[in-house]
């Protein structure tokens, strides 16, 4: 949620942010109007309540001949106070809804523009050149006995998959490597719930523009998380944290669920875009002043992981028009996919500043009092796309795949060989 003081003091800054995102700046004006209405409703309620209290004192000391008229007024005031209280509550709820509709204030340094206006910050590693026609990840995975989408389609429909044999072992190896790296860096490992209630989903910003990609269990009013960011952010919902103990860093492993609405016809082959996948996610609670530096640290941990897998990748600074509602700035790591001849996103890290913390009522206490804090998230490994990158970049002419050195102890082999 945006800072109400910012809305009142500098609404044009918020309008400019909305325009930079390609979103409606009129939402800012709607929020201003809702705030004015709320303040007027609060003032009317408080004035009537004050009159009611004063009248109560008068009645207590009034002579008998004056009491009937005063009691009539007291009855009238009681009805007015009740109506004013309801109007205040309605105005407060409407103001909150108006504030929730506005996305986070974009970072001044985030590049402006749409999806294709990102800025490449660096390229790490060199895309491989093959002396043979490279196979895509699905063909490699099927030959290795690692990926089965045909049976998954029979069981669950499109955009599902089985990881079998070395495919399943490869997932466990990647998760183990990611968790060991994160724990070494000081993260607390967490296995969070994947079913959450509306306040957690709304608080993290996934019930606005992203709502169409969320699975909702309507009967029980649960949501399936698309990332453990949701569960990890809400872990301290309604709490006040000691600033001296920040940053608090958690690394969560969970299954993630996405409807992929609007993706019809995109990435229909293989496991690049699926409805269900596993992911290791970093999450940090820190001070607002440390948020930008923490963002860079999360990015460095992502780069460290991909470098260990010997995958060529690049880092991009995502343009404002491609940011999620909660992110003020986002960096993506994109791995080279040989058969597509382009880079594809495999990890991302976002600085959400105070936005999620305000919505989730998470604050910190320091010598200056109780204040908002910042939240940040970063993918350490999203399993399907990382497997895609590993298989395609490390393939050999016979369809075998060289195992990255960082995974060999876990897998117990240097090379994954075709079963057919």
UniProtKB/Swiss-Prot annotation:
Pathway(s) it belongs to: Aminoacyl-tRNA biosynthesis; selenocysteinyl-tRNA(Sec) biosynthesis; L-seryl-tRNA(Sec) from L-serine and tRNA(Sec): step 1/1
GO BP annotations listed: selenocysteine biosynthetic process; seryl-tRNA aminoacylation
E.C. number(s) listed in UniProt: 6.1.1.11
Location in the cell: Cytoplasm
Keyword Nucleotide-binding: yes
PROSITE patterns referenced in this protein's UniProt entry, alphabetically: AA_TRNA_LIGASE_II
GO MF term set: ATP binding; serine-tRNA ligase activity
InterPro entries: aa-tRNA-synt_IIb (IPR002314), aa-tRNA-synth_II (IPR006195), aa-tRNA-synth_II/BPL/LPL (IPR045864), Ser-tRNA-ligase_type_1 (IPR002317), Ser-tRNA-synth_1_N (IPR015866), SerRS_1_N_sf (IPR042103), SerRS_core (IPR033729), tRNA-bd_arm (IPR010978)
Broad enzyme group: ligase
Binding site for ATP: 258-260, 274, 345-348
Keywords: Aminoacyl-tRNA synthetase, ATP-binding, Cytoplasm, Ligase, Nucleotide-binding, Protein biosynthesis
Catalytic reaction(s) noted: tRNA(Ser) + L-serine + ATP = L-seryl-tRNA(Ser) + AMP + diphosphate + H(+); tRNA(Sec) + L-serine + ATP = L-seryl-tRNA(Sec) + AMP + diphosphate + H(+)
Entry binding sites for L-serine: 227-229, 281, 379
Gene Ontology, cellular component aspect: cytoplasm
Subunit structure: Homodimer. The tRNA molecule binds across the dimer.
NCBIfam families attached to this UniProt entry: serS (TIGR00414)
UniProt family annotation: Belongs to the class-II aminoacyl-tRNA synthetase family. Type-1 seryl-tRNA synthetase subfamily.
Domain observations: Consists of two distinct domains, a catalytic core and a N-terminal extension that is involved in tRNA binding.
Function: Catalyzes the attachment of serine to tRNA(Ser). Is also able to aminoacylate tRNA(Sec) with serine, to form the misacylated tRNA L-seryl-tRNA(Sec), which will be further converted into selenocysteinyl-tRNA(Sec).
Protein name: Serine--tRNA ligase
Organism of derivation: Acidothermus cellulolyticus (strain ATCC 43068 / DSM 8971 / 11B)
Gene symbol of the encoding locus: serS
């Amino acid at each position: 949620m945006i800072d109400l003081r910012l809305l009142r003091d500098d609404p044009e800054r918020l309008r400019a942010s909305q325009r930079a995102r390609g979103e409606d700046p009129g939402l800012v004006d709607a929020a201003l109007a809702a705030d004015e209405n709320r303040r007027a409703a609060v003032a009317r309620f408080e004035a009537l309540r004050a009159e009611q209290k004063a009248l109560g004192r008068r009645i207590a000391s009034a002579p008998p001949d004056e009491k009937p008229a005063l009691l009539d007024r007291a009855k009238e005031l009681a009805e007015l106070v009740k109506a004013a209280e309801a109007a205040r509550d309605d105005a407060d709820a409407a103001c909150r809804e108006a504030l929730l509709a506005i996305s986070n204030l974009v970072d001044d340094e985030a590049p402006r523009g749409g999806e294709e206006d990102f800025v490449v910050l660096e390229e790490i590693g060199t895309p491989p050149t093959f002396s043979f026609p490279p196979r895509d990840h699905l063909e490699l995975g099927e030959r290795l006995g690692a990926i089965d989408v045909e049976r998954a389609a029979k069981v669950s429909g499109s955009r599902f998959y089985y990881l079998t044999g070395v495919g399943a072992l490869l997932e466990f190896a990647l998760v183990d490597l990611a968790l060991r790296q994160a724990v070494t860096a000081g993260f607390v490992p967490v296995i969070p719930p994947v079913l959450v209630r509306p306040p957690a989903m709304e608080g993290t910003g996934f019930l606005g523009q992203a709502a169409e990609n969320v699975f909702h269990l309507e009967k029980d009013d649960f949501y399936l998380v698309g990332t453990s960011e949701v569960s990890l952010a809400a872990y301290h919902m309604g709490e006040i944290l000691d600033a001296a103990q920040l940053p608090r860093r958690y690394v969560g492993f969970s299954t993630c669920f996405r409807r992929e609405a609007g993706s019809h016809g995109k990435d229909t082959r293989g496991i690049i875009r699926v409805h269900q996948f596993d992911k290791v996610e970093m999450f940090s609670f820190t001070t607002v002043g440390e948020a930008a530096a923490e963002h860079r640290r999360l990015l460095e941990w992502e780069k460290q992981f991909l470098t260990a897998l010997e995958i060529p990748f690049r880092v991009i600074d995502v343009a404002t028009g491609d940011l999620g509602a909660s992110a003020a700035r986002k960096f993506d790591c994109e791995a080279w996919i040989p058969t597509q001849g382009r880079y594809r996103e495999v990890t991302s890290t976002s600085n959400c500043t105070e936005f999620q913390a305000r919505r989730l009522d998470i604050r910190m206490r320091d010598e200056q009092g109780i204040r908002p804090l910042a939240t940040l998230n970063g993918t350490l490994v999203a399993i399907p796309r990382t497997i895609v990158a590993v298989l395609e970049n490390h393939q050999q002419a016979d369809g075998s795949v060289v195992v990255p050195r960082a995974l060999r102890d876990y897998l117990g082999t240097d090379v994954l060989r075709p079963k057919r």
